[in-house]
């Protein structure tokens, strides 16, 4: 990033507006990774916050089972997901049964490879103890405690690591009967070596019964409760459970969801998926999509034969993958999704100024002079001083800067008096670059 902010090239290309627009935009510098930006995560009043106490929403992708599609879990693919898709979290799904860790403990090496890649790339990573056909997490509780003792010993000082200790308890297994007692023991094992990294705990009925967990929460303050859904099968009743759990102060993490039905294959159901994503973003609930694979099923993100190392074009993505990529890229421009908001419809001015028709005044203010935080934060005020209303949708603002050879970017709209959901941001490359400006942020 061009760090001397008073020397950054600032070039604004304006359309015209109908009313006063006040915006505060914060841009993580291109050298700042998600972990550098947010640091140690924790739970505060049932919501996920970063080390500055600011609410944060994680959005990313899960691997498929490592025993089947582990080749897609590598630094190159994860880097592409970070830089092109905009993920800030990756989930590595290590099955316990079905030729998973219990019969093939060497799969732990792939988990370690994924964690090392995530550390290097500065993204958060979920280590997923993926129980499924084994139903009850207590079946392999001893192995879980051994595994998570090793993971916590290795990564207890790494703020990007998140432990998911029971993917989808099912088969009549209940929160109070089996899951909570198991979670207490495994949490104690983790906390003996790692005092503060996040822990995600699955809930009953394939991680749908978060209401039961909300009514009898675990004592650990940095625990989240998993809800899983598949858009073609699960609808409003599960969204209602999220609202209920949040009203009880429980922190919720959608650590797995799919655009398909619950089989993983029917669909994809994109309108239903959009309803879910809008809801999760509105409630500030973090989410991870299933899954990074080229398997011939609706929930797969990649088309059959896609490269194992990223670089995917539109043709390499499935219908689901294209949709999820769009959602993650759009979500990277949200202000964290922490406060439910209703988009505001811009209105025509009732008392326009006396200036010449179409006159536009733009005021820019730098609100961050700290050279050590790798961020650009700005406030922009735009006013139509003419006598004729002009549409806000005609407005474009470009902010030019140099990326210093680091292509990743995190963009956030902190506030806008027309509602942050009505502001769209993206990055682009100018036709003619200079040694001081080779990128721009477009605000519309």
Curated annotation (Swiss-Prot):
Region Disordered, residue ranges: 332-358
GO molecular function (one): cellulose binding
GO biological process: cellulose catabolic process
Active site: 168 (proton donor), 256 (nucleophile)
Biased composition regions of type Low complexity, renumbered to the chain: 339-358
Record-stated family: Belongs to the glycosyl hydrolase 5 (cellulase A) family.
Protein name: Endoglucanase N
Species whose genome carries this gene: Pectobacterium atrosepticum
